[in-house]
Amino acid sequence: MTAKLIDGLALSKTLRADVAARAAALTARGHQPGLAVVLVGDNPASEVYVRNKVKACHDNGLGSSFDRYPADLPEAELLARIDELNRDPRIHGILVQLPLPPHIDSHKVIEAIAPEKDVDGFHVANAGALMTGQPLFRPCTPYGVMKMLAAYEIPLQGANAVVIGRSNIVGKPMALLLLEAGATVTICHSKTRDLAAHTRNADVVVAATGLRNILTADMVKPGAAVIDVGMNRDEAGKLCGDVDFAGVKEVAGYITPVPGGVGPMTITMLLVNTIEAAEREAAANA
C-alpha cells in the first residue's frame, strides 16, 4: 500500500481564494485587512519566512507593513514599536518573527501584542482561551493541520492520536485541537521512553520535533495518517521533514510531503486569522 498524499499546496490555494474574496469584501467597505510583520536580526530562515508572509498578503489583497531591525535592537525599542502597532487602526494582525536575539525576552514581546491582534495565537490570553475551548485565534500550524485532516475526511472522533513534540508553537496547541475534535491524544517528546510503543497504536501521528527520521516505517500502524511538521535539511542540503518519507509512505494511509505539505498551510492560516481579526473589528465598528 502506498499512502495517499495530503496536498497542502492545493488545499492552501483553495483557502487563499476564500481569503482573497473576504479581503476584497472588507476593502470595499473601507476595512482593508492589515498584517504587520516585524523581523529583528538577519536569520536566513526567518528572512525567507517573512518574505513569503509579506508576499502572501500582497497576493491575496491584504495590506502589510514590514519592519526590519538590526540584531542589536534594544528590547525597549521593539516593545515601543509593538505598542504603536497595537494602536494603529490599519493593522489587524501583528507577527513578530521568532526566534529573537538572545538579549530580547520573547515572552515579554509576545505578551506586549494586543490579544485581538495576536494572529499567531501565542499570547497567554489566547493560549488560555484555546485551553478552555473558546479560542480567539488558533495557532497557525496546528490550525493548518486540522484543516488538512478535515479536507481529507480523516476521522478524529475516538481515534488514537500521537503528537511528537511539546512546543508552545506546535505540539501543545496541536494536542488541544485534536482533543477538541474528539481524539484520544498522547504527547510524546525527547524524554519519552519508547516512542514506537505509542506511535504503533496511533491512527494519526503528528511529528513536530525538528529531528530527521524520528518516525520510521516500523513505527507506524498500517493505514495511519502521518502529518510531518518538521523542516530540516538532509546531507545534500535538500529540504526534508521529521518523517522517513520513503519508508513511511509504504505503510501509512495518508502522509504529508515536505515540502508541499504543512508549510504552505501555516502561512495560509496566518492570512485566515488576520481576515478574522479584521472582520471582528469591522463588525464591532459597524
From Swiss-Prot:
What this protein is reported to do is described as:
Catalyzes the oxidation of 5,10-methylenetetrahydrofolate to 5,10-methenyltetrahydrofolate and then the hydrolysis of 5,10-methenyltetrahydrofolate to 10-formyltetrahydrofolate.
Q: What family does this belong to? A: Belongs to the tetrahydrofolate dehydrogenase/cyclohydrolase family.
Q: Which residues bind NADP(+)?
A: G165, R166, S167, S190
List cystine links: none
Q: Which Pfam families match?
A: THF_DHG_CYH, THF_DHG_CYH_C
Assembly description = Homodimer.
Leader sequence range is none
Per its record, what are the GO molecular function terms?
Answer: methenyltetrahydrofolate cyclohydrolase activity; methylenetetrahydrofolate dehydrogenase (NADP+) activity
* NCBIfam families for the chain: PRK10792.1, PRK14186.1, PRK14189.1
InterPro entries the UniProt entry points to = Aminoacid_DH-like_N_sf (IPR046346), NAD(P)-bd_dom_sf (IPR036291), THF_DH/CycHdrlase (IPR000672), THF_DH/CycHdrlase_cat_dom (IPR020630), THF_DH/CycHdrlase_CS (IPR020867), THF_DH/CycHdrlase_NAD-bd_dom (IPR020631)
Gene Ontology cellular-component annotations: cytosol
Key words, A-Z: Amino-acid biosynthesis, Histidine biosynthesis, Hydrolase, Methionine biosynthesis, Multifunctional enzyme, NADP, One-carbon metabolism, Oxidoreductase, Purine biosynthesis
- The domain of life for this entry's organism is Bacteria
The UniProt catalytic activity note for this protein reads:
(6R)-5,10-methylene-5,6,7,8-tetrahydrofolate + NADP(+) = (6R)-5,10-methenyltetrahydrofolate + NADPH; (6R)-5,10-methenyltetrahydrofolate + H2O = (6R)-10-formyltetrahydrofolate + H(+)
Listed pathway(s): One-carbon metabolism; tetrahydrofolate interconversion
**Single GO biological process annotation from the record:** tetrahydrofolate interconversion
Q: What Enzyme Commission number(s) appear in the record?
A: 1.5.1.5, 3.5.4.9
SUPFAM superfamilies with a match to the protein in the record? Aminoacid dehydrogenase-like, N-terminal domain (SSF53223), NAD(P)-binding Rossmann-fold domains (SSF51735)
State the protein's name: Bifunctional protein FolD
Whose protein is this, by species?
A: Paraburkholderia xenovorans (strain LB400)
Question: Which gene is the coding source of this polypeptide chain?
Answer: folD
